[in-house]
Amino acid sequence: MANAEVSVPVGDVVVVPTEGNEGENPEDTKTQVILQLQPVQQGIYEAGSENSAAVVAVETHSIHKIEEGIDASSIEGNEDMEIAYPITCGESKAVLLWKKFVCPGINVKCVKFNDQLISPKHFVHLAGKSTLKDWKRAIRLGGIMLRKMMDSGQIDFYQHDKVCSNTCRSTKFDLLISSARAPVPGQQTSVVQTPTSADGNITQIAISEESMEEAGLEWNSALTAAVTMATEEGIKKESEEISEDTLMFWKGIADVGLMEEVVCNIQKEMEELLRGVQQRLIQAPFQVTDAAVLNNVANTFGLMDAVKRVLDNRRKQVEQGEEQFLYTLADLERQLEEQKKQAQDPRLKSQTVQNVVLMPVSTPKPPKRPRLQRPASTTVLSPSPVQQPQFTVISPITITPVGQSFSMGNIPVATLSQGSSPVTVHTLPSGPQLFRYATVVSSAKSNSPDTVTIHPSSSLALLSSTSMQDGSSLGNMATMVSPMELVAMESGLTSAIQAVESTSEDGQTIIEIDPAPDSEADDTEGKAVILETGLRTEEKVVAEMEEHQHQVHNVEIVVLED
């Protein structure tokens, strides 16, 4: 074909003889190319109808005569003939080779750019439009987006009916009629006008008829164009009134006897379309094209209310399930907290037992020795630290236990005899010792006037003393007051203890301590201690001892010095 570059798919190339050239050879006539099947302005259609155009199209291009031996049906089968579309993307220009443009086309090397065969995606990247997600919108054919050209049916993938990836559905509902099959050359073509839309656009379809003897028509998927929308957005059924043109259109189809076949074809196309959507949902994520198709179908057939009802029912079910889920979750959390508490109790018990077992046993501290407290009015004579003092008890004094045992173990006892009165010397070890004695008063009227008996009942603190000189027997002992305190004296001194019960009205007891020995005392007699008593022989305790502090009250201690 000389200078013949067809810029449309082969299936849309039609050779149509005009009425004025019926007697001539059809091959000598000019041909017209159908680029698209979409609404056209009514003025254009009227001009075309006045010229008795056999084929209605938006654009018609006159091409040179087809060379002898080559007809329209042989163009697709001829491998030597290449069909190309000039495309642009931004400032870049390239050529789309249609026979290499197969579904899905995005990564197929079908674009010739700078003598290189690249894919449309690569071409968009080289043109600097890679930020656009849709490559069909980035590529333009004659100033029109490639997606819009494919949605309107002006161009399609090569042999799309045989090779399809199921990911190439258009976003327009009128894609159902985009793959119209061209009429066979030599057939007469009649024009059927669809209803006029509100903006003045009309939709037209071409119906090829055979000879008058044959009443049948060859229908294919392109005949579903009778149900296309007047505009790209479609006409809502509930908002439009049925016009007279619409009524005449469908009445004409019914009069011809094609209503049943049209309905069957529409049903098949709808089933295939919806089945394809379901299959793509299984194979790949939901796509924008599927959403557009479903939206157009729902709006066309008034199914949006039904879809909303389904959504409401599902939302109620989800809310009920969510409430049940939250209740179950709260119950599980409560059970988990209880189990945690139960698990922590044995741990605490075991930890307590372990702490008790591992706790070091602390031995109780030995009790402190009671501190000896002396009256503040007394003069304390500290003993010599070199010589250990000893306690000497001079008999005749017998200690008889009353009420409790009294132990004098490990105490050296020396018995001395002088004259008729035995003297027993008890030597006590150094250090403070605590003895409890009872207050017992023995008068001169007793059987043994030289003996005083002391019973353990009260507190008597023996501090210190020195060794006593041997003395004679004690005479005229009448009274001895207890409790009494023996005060420590320095070593080498002869102590004279006199217990005298005063006959005065205040009844004080005076204990006189003479640190110096009696110079007039006879060495042979060895008088060391003189106990003088008054005239009164009745028992009178003036000194009081506190239980815990062991202090002597109301006792006056007088130290006599030379």
UniProtKB/Swiss-Prot annotation:
Q: Which residues carry this modification: N-acetylalanine?
A: 2
Please provide, in alphabetical order, the Gene Ontology terms of the cellular component aspect for this entry. cytoplasm; nucleoplasm; nucleus
Annotated TM spans: none
Q: List the Gene3D superfamilies.
A: SAND domain-like
**Main subcellular localisation:** nucleus
Q: Which SMART domains match?
A: SAND
Report which residue ranges the record marks as coiled coil. Answer: 311-355
Please state what the protein is called: Glucocorticoid modulatory element-binding protein 1
